UniProtKB/Swiss-Prot annotation:
GO CC annotation: host cell membrane; membrane
Lipid bilayer topology: Multi-pass membrane protein
Protein name: Putative transmembrane protein ORF202
Transmembrane segments: 13-33, 40-60, 87-107, 156-176, 177-197
Amino acid sequence: MNTHYLTINLLRAIAFGLAYSILEVNVPLFHYIPVVDYRVFYLIIFAIANMTLPLSLFLGNFFLSMASEDMFYWIIKAQTPFQYAWYYPVIDGIPIADVIEVIISVFSYYYYVRHHNETTNIFHFIFVDTDNTSSSQQQQCGMWYAFTHGKAHDEYGALTLVLVSVLAILSSHSLSLTAFATLSLIVGTGIFVDLWAHCFHH
């Protein structure tokens, strides 16, 4: 199994949380959809976006992504968390639901690591591709070196797509453009992480 599998899933969950928080700040769907209906829609969207196997990894991604979305939402809004609905209790500025989600995600990832002999080291993932056994191959597959020395053209394209999407989301007042830019952000982030994970820098 790819030793980067857990790291890729962590980054994907956080990236989707960030993308959705930007969308929610600019297009507050909960203003137009009944509370219960919106929560069902919200859970379905996050479940689909984080769908993977095994179940423990899916649960970790699912809850981490939702907690990340809330965290990024409050940061972007520059607000202290408050209880906006009965299902989102907040005590002294601490969102209890997010704390529970983080705890569940940690235990889910722990279970996954214990039962699948999987490890993650995000710094090693960024700088060296450990799937290659020889030291010369590892040096050739050092994505950080390739990225900083003009040898990662595909990653530059994906990163440009991500940056343009973020700018479009922040400056757009059109629902259709915001939705399209958010989709581009998710796709661009996924491509960037996937290319980096496979040491593809031609």
